[in-house]
Structure formats: structure tokens, C-alpha cells
Amino acid sequence: VLGYELDLGELSPQEKKQVAAQIEWYKEYRPTLQYGDFFRVPIRRQGLVSWAAVAPDKKQAVVLLAQRLCTAAPPADHLTVPALLPTARYRVTAVPQQVAVARFGGLVKHIAPVKLSADGLVLRTVNRHYALPDGSFTAEASGAALAAGIPLNDQFLGTGYHEGLRLWGDFGSQLYLVEQLGENEEDHTK
């Protein structure tokens, strides 16, 4: 199920760390991805696609939400997770991912205190060793609420940045891990 179609020797040190973290994450959740029930999830707006793998015991799910092309001022996105236990409580967490600073191109020079070239030495060096957190998200909800869809953080619209902002752009995507809360785990939504 997991594969990379790229030359690993051409990756920056930052990208190599990201690939290693992705492989470790996949190994941990492989049973759900390989043996869970697989669903194409209905989506509320055009341009998005979603797939979910739900563990047979309904205690865990992995959901992909992907965007084809970015649109100006998109409506709020919702994450829908089918086939969970309606009365059970779940924690939803965005699988950590990062975005290269270079993705912002010439926008960086507008916020930097000194004049920088978008393809100059400083930004190329930063890009090799640092990336911005993308789309940090955690929520708790019932299986019924997840089946109806819960709202997600906004996407980047050209200005401003915070860790929870989704920096998708064209063909952007995010994986979400959904895990049932144990009886001894605190429900942070009360």
C-alpha cells in the first residue's frame, strides 16, 4: 500500500526526515490501512475527494481528504468519517505534515525584514533544513457527528499563517487519524 515514486537520493535533508516519519507512521497504522473496510466518502463540495479505511472493530479509521484544484475563497471544508460506532467518542488528529518554505515563493520577501530573493542562497538554505507545519488539527466528536461531518480549519488564502492553517494549494491533501476514546480518557469537549 505504501510506495514512493521518486529518487530518494535527490531529496533534501528535511525531505528525508519527512519520508522516514511517513514510513514509521504507516508501519504503526498498517493493519487499518490494509485490512480495514475501505470507503469512498461523499463530499459536500466539488474539487475534493475523500477515502476512508475503517478498522473492523470500528475503533480506528484513517481518512484522506484531497483537493484537485484550489479555488479562490473556498467554502469551509468538513471531514466525514463513515461506519463508526454512532455513540462512541473519537479523537480526530491530522497526521503531521510540513510544507517547504519555497512553496511561498515571492511572498516571503514581503514579510522578511531584509531584501531576499525567492531563489537566493538564504531561502534555498532555509528550504533544505526547515519546513512549516501544515494543518495541525485535533478534535473530539461522536461517531454520529463524524458521519455527518465536522468542520476543519481554513485553507491558506494568500495572507497570514498559523500552525493550524491548511497550506494545500492545487493537489493538496491531508491524512486524518480517528481513534476511539477509551473509557478512562478524558473527553476535552465537555
For each predicted feature, which ranges?
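Active-site-proximal substrate-binding groove within the catalytic cores of carbohydrate-active enzymes
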Residues: 1-152, 156, 176
